[in-house]
Amino acid sequence: MRSFLYGILAFAVLARSSAVAAFPIPDESRPLSKTSPDTVAPRSLRVEAQEVIQSGRGDGYGGFWKNIIPSTNKIIKKPDIKIGKLIEAAKKAKKKMTKS
């Protein structure tokens, strides 16, 4: 079984080296992939009205688009939650847990 594996490996190495030797100049190996600059149309990967947010560290918006958040808020209403009140409630709950 091992000799069969070595035979396949040797065949792959020889086939690769002979294919590379057939095209000594790297540009000749792919003549069909080149296109003339006149026929290439400019492409954009962004859909119209999508702007990428430049986010800071830790703000949670790493690369999302600006129009995703308002459109998501229309589908599912985001409740207004005061983070300070949640932190205070968590501290009170922690104190109760440590007392008992």
UniProtKB/Swiss-Prot annotation:
Residues 1-22 form the signal peptide. This is RxLR effector protein PITG_18683. It comes from the Eukaryota. Interacts with the host calmodulin. The keyword Cytoplasm does not apply. A motif (RxLR-dEER) lies at residues 43-57. The keyword Secreted applies. A motif (Calmodulin-binding motif) lies at residues 78-82. Keywords: Secreted, Signal, Virulence. Its main location: secreted. One of its GO terms (cellular component) is host cell. The RxLR-dEER motif acts to carry the protein into the host cell cytoplasm through binding to cell surface phosphatidylinositol-3-phosphate. The amino acids 78-82 in the C-terminal region of are important for binding to host calmodulin. Secreted effector that associates with calmodulin to interfere with plant defense-associated calcium signaling in hosts. Belongs to the RxLR effector family. It comes from Phytophthora infestans (strain T30-4).
